Amino acid sequence: MKNIEKSEIIISLVDVDKEFGDKKVLDQINLDIKRGDFVTLLGPSGSGKTTILRLIGGFEWTTRGEIKFNGIDIKDVPAHKRDTATIFQDYALFPHLSVRGNIEFGLKLKRIKKKAEEIPDVVWKKFEHLKKKWQDKQKRKIKELKILQAHLEKLLENPQLDIKKRKKLQDKLDDSDFRYSNWENYLTSKSESFKKKYLTRKITKQEINKEITDIIDLVGLTGNENRAISELSGGMKQRVALARSLVIEPEIVLLDEPLSALDTKIRQKMQVFLKKIQQKLGLTFIFVTHDQDEALQLSDKIAIIRNGKIAQYDEPKQIYDYPVNKWVANFIGDSNFFQAKYIKKNQVEILGLKLYTIHDEFIPGQKLDCLIRPEDIDIDLNSGYFKGKVIQNIYKGSYYSLDIKVENTIINVETNDFYDLETQVFLKWDDDAIHLMEMENAEI
């Protein structure tokens, strides 16, 4: 897949469903990933984030929908033909090979473009002749499939169809969609096979040695080339797995919770290292994790996955500051939630007090969820919006986490200052600290 014309959007998932038997694990997934971005799929266990990664990598097939690589649907393309490399949670290193042996493994299959002067004119003429035949066949097959799909879609519009008949027709339509994807890739696949045979050569031993030396230096493994995998720490194994993936020069690196087995300090170092490598090489990284802090620190964009759907897809700061709903807000960080009532433009009522808000998009009288992050609340001993007392004080290393009781409401506050239990305090915040969200099934 290396010779497809490049576009800004490198991967696009369009209306992707995935079913395992009668269970739907992904439901209408739509996701565009830009070339060179570090994108994290974040969600709780069982949300579907790893399934999305496996679909992109070709380890699972979609039930329906499209997975586009540079604009072409590749859902029927097997994993080994996709321009991706995958780093698994357990690294999947070969225990019988050394560090060098693991990295070298993929290189042995790599081929190098021949110089133009090394290719006879007759080869180019043959390629152009075959390319025309492939194009004609591709157009004919795609036209046939479009006619078939239109016919099946027309039949499915009949409301009188019983469940069994409808499922049979839907299965035929899904199958035709896979065949359509196959023929959409036909010209590219045939062209690449021809180029591999006639326009490339095997990589030489000297070239292999240079590439291994370069990648080992890049990932910081110099001096460890001949060590056995069993002798390495978790962090070093991770570097070997990364080197093995990068040395084959993929366009996309898929990472399935690769840091989850590491202890905290090594994990933090590897987070910095991964981001540095990704930025240096300009590759697209798609990273799966359930760790919110990890996602916020590493990502250019985060897709929050919940129950097989994308709850929100945006830049980390936008998701943290402007979550689309209460669930996302609670999942992505510590939160204080209040029931709020929108009074009028730029005015909201919280805990019986009317306050200024930067929000102006809601309807007067509308009931809303209100989010205020603990770190956005200030403590004052003399004045503020609400008066309360400290009922819990927990030292977190770089700050104190306080629970403040305001009438019947507990408000969590993060502060650098220590306050004794039972201390009377006032709480206040900046206008933009209030984030209002629509309530599910809210009444006006």
UniProtKB/Swiss-Prot annotation:
Gene3D superfamilies: 2.40.50.100, P-loop containing nucleotide triphosphate hydrolases
Keywords: ATP-binding, Cell membrane, Membrane, Nucleotide-binding, Translocase, Transport
Predominant subcellular localization, coarse grouping: membrane
Region annotated Insert, chain positions: 111-201
Coiled coil: none
Molecular function GO terms recorded: ABC-type polyamine transporter activity; ATP binding; ATP hydrolysis activity
The EC number(s) this enzyme carries: 7.6.2.11
Protein name (database record): Spermidine/putrescine import ATP-binding protein PotA
Cellular component GO terms held in the UniProt record: ATP-binding cassette (ABC) transporter complex
Organism from which the protein derives: Mesomycoplasma hyopneumoniae (strain J / ATCC 25934 / NCTC 10110) (Mycoplasma hyopneumoniae)
Function: Part of the ABC transporter complex PotABCD involved in spermidine/putrescine import. Responsible for energy coupling to the transport system.
Pfam family, one: ABC_tran
Location of this chain's protein in the cell: Cell membrane
Family per record: Belongs to the ABC transporter superfamily. Spermidine/putrescine importer (TC 3.A.1.11.1) family.
Domain ABC transporter: 11-332
Residues annotated for ATP binding in this entry: G43, P44, S45, G46, S47, G48, K49, T50
Subunit structure: The complex is composed of two ATP-binding proteins (PotA), two transmembrane proteins (PotB and PotC) and a solute-binding protein (PotD).
Reactions that this protein is recorded to catalyse: ATP + H2O + polyamine-[polyamine-binding protein]Side 1 = ADP + phosphate + polyamineSide 2 + [polyamine-binding protein]Side 1
SUPFAM superfamilies on file: MOP-like, P-loop containing nucleoside triphosphate hydrolases
Protein topology in the membrane: Peripheral membrane protein
Signal peptide bounds: none
